[in-house]
Curated annotation (Swiss-Prot):
Keywords: Coiled coil, Cytoplasm, Endosome, Membrane, Protein transport, Transport. Probable peripherally associated component of the endosomal sorting required for transport complex III (ESCRT-III). It comes from Danio rerio. This is Charged multivesicular body protein 1a. It is found in: Cytoplasm; Endosome membrane. GO terms for biological process: cerebellum development; endosome transport via multivesicular body sorting pathway; late endosome to vacuole transport; protein transport. InterPro entries: Snf7_fam. Disruption phenotype: Reduced cerebellar and forebrain volume. The phenotype of these animals resemble that seen in those after bmi1 knockdown, supporting a link between chmp1a and bmi1. In chmp1a knockdown models, the internal granule and molecular layers were more severely affected than the Purkinje cells, which are consistent with the relatively preserved folia observed in humans with CHMP1A mutations.
């Protein structure tokens, strides 16, 4: 059982490393998006953005899997602990029977204290196990994410992509709508800032 626990923890660490690698790859693809936008190549930027989002989702999936494996490791750890607790409970029960048969109140009190401690430990272990388990949901890669990533990188880099939107095939992007929304928000903020200054 200890070997199983070790293997589960080792696997969890491997999955976490894969998640970090995927995140690093995603950042690399985002840098390529920026470079493509600087070269006014929106179509390549779109491909790199899709790669970046796919890698990011891949990283999230590796992380979810690592979490699930870690949860199983926690269950195995809890099972091992419960086995030890059950053994201790058996010993406590035998000691309680012995103390009761001799009717020594000090011994009975000491055994009861030990028994209560074991029950509290059992409650803590059960609580930890329940808290470690949570359901994971999978993410899809909607087109809007690609468009948002392109806009975000363009805005961070101070690049204009609106004039390049005409290069995209019809219906291939919602960037125009998103860009208009961003511009509207910026206009509203500018008006509010001007009102505050006056």
């Amino acid at each position: 059982m200890d070997d199983t626990l070790f293997q589960l923890k080792f696997t969890s660490k491997q999955l976490e490393r894969l998640a970090k690698k995927a995140e690093k790859d995603s950042k690399s693809e985002q840098a390529k998006v920026k470079k493509a936008l600087q070269q006014k190549n929106v179509e390549c930027a779109r491909v790199y953005a899709e790669n970046a989002i796919r890698k990011k989702n891949e990283g999230l999936n590796w992380l979810r899997m690592a979490s699930r494996v870690d949860a199983v490791a926690s269950k195995v750890q809890t099972a091992l602990t419960m086995k030890g607790v059950a053994k201790n409970m058996t010993q406590v029960t035998k000691a309680l029977d012995k103390a009761l048969s001799s009717m020594d109140l000090q011994k009975v009190s000491a055994v009861m204290d030990k028994f209560e401690t074991q029950v509290q430990n059992l409650d803590v272990h059960t609580s930890v196990m329940e808290d470690s388990m949570s359901s994971a949901t999978t993410l899809s890669t909607p087109q809007q994410q690609v468009d948002d990533l392109i806009l975000q990188i363009a805005e961070e880099s101070g690049l204009e992509v609106e004039d390049q939107l005409s290069q995209l095939p019809a219906g291939a992007s919602a960037l125009g709508e998103t860009s208009a929304r961003a511009q509207e928000k910026e206009d509203q903020l500018s008006r509010r800032l001007a009102a505050l200054r006056n």
